[in-house]
Amino acid sequence: MGVGLSTLEQKLTEIISAPVEALGYELVGIEFIRGRQSTLRIYIDSDDGITVDACADVSHQVSAVLDVEDPITVAYNLEVSSPGLDRPMFTAEHYTRYLGEEVTLVLRMAMQNRRKWQGIIKAVDGEMITVTVDGKDEVFALSNIQKANLVPHF
């Protein structure tokens, strides 16, 4: 389960994971963005990468399950995609997998009067992540991380 997810996102993750995994894909994570046009974004991956057809298959299966379960009370768009180069990070396992990589964090509550941080993932200890920012180690509670993405390098 993703750290820092809302109750709705936790419920959606539980509902969505089975059909995604049944199709042979990894559910990387989800985002539910509320607004005038709400969006449920599902990130999937596999060892062979993700094709447009894979996204369409997952979208079809997940739509059917969500129509039955009906956990979302507002109109929304469903998007299914690969994590991309700026891969979002949702779980402690994601941070562990990408130790030594550069990450951008947006915090729920500011630390040292900052909500945005960028640095190198140094360590993961349970619910805490250590990121080296400008040569100094900073420790963040995973539950305080609103959004995290790898920084692609070309």
UniProtKB/Swiss-Prot annotation:
Annotated SUPFAM superfamilies: YhbC-like, C-terminal domain, YhbC-like, N-terminal domain
Record keyword Cytoplasm present: yes
Compartment list: Cytoplasm
Family matches, as Pfam families: DUF150_C, RimP_N
Record field: transmembrane: none
GO BP annotation list: ribosomal small subunit assembly; translation
Keywords: Cytoplasm, Ribosome biogenesis
Any single Gene Ontology cellular-component annotation: cytosol
Chief location category: cytoplasm
Gene3D superfamilies for the chain: Ribosome maturation factor RimP, C-terminal domain, RimP-like superfamily, N-terminal
InterPro entries reported in the protein's UniProt record: Ribosome_maturation_RimP (IPR003728), RimP_C (IPR028998), RimP_C_sf (IPR036847), RimP_N (IPR028989), RimP_N_sf (IPR035956)
Family under the similarity heading: Belongs to the RimP family.
Entries under NCBIfam families matching the protein: PRK00092.1-1
Its job: Required for maturation of 30S ribosomal subunits.
UniProt protein name: Ribosome maturation factor RimP
Species the sequence originates in: Yersinia pseudotuberculosis serotype O:1b (strain IP 31758)
Primary gene name: rimP
